[in-house]
Amino acid sequence: MARNVGFFICILILAMDVSAGILGIEAEIAQNKVKHLKMWIFECRDPSYTAFKYGLAACILLVLAHVTANFLGGCLCVASRQDLEKSSANKQLAVASLIFTWIILAIAFSMLIVGTMANSRSRKNCGISHHRVLSIGGILCFVHGLFAVAYYISATASTREQTSAGHA
């Protein structure tokens, strides 16, 4: 039963991240459909409410996937570099995956927020254009999904190793 729950959680994390990625790319497509005037490196364009909604939904799903992976994956405590080097391969993989998920979350979330806020109804942008910010944020959501699932699997495996070593 526990393996079925773990499989379901992995599918849930992947589904949220893939959905966030698709929404980020769809937001970029919706943003490109809005009329704009380009002069040299400056660009004036109207905001796209559809791109705003898709970008906001992508941000929410990305954060939910991250929170799900971190809370359900458990807490790994590593006090020092020597402690990390002595730990099992599962724990080392979990720590590396955790670090990468946080880095990717920070970059993807920032890009999605910048693209989403550029499409807020209260803004008519004139300035240096931010091309492909939403689509790059969406692509990073896919990468986040891979590392989040790797973290969840390795963290739960590491926890099982520690509990079975404690009973032996």
UniProtKB/Swiss-Prot annotation:
Tissue: Mainly expressed in roots, inflorescences and developing leaves, and, at low levels, in mature leaves.
Membrane-related topology note: Multi-pass membrane protein
S-S pairs: none
Signal peptide feature range: 1-20
Superkingdom to which the source organism belongs: Eukaryota
Phenotype of null mutants: Developmental defects of pistils, some being bent or coiled or twisted, and some showing unfused carpels with exposed ovules. The vcc-3 deal2-1 double mutant shows leaf asymmetry. The vcc-3 deal2-1 deal3-1 triple mutant shows a strong leaf asymmetry.
Protein location: Endoplasmic reticulum membrane
Record family assignment: Belongs to the DESIGUAL family.
Protein name as catalogued: Protein DESIGUAL 2
Species of the source: Arabidopsis thaliana (Mouse-ear cress)
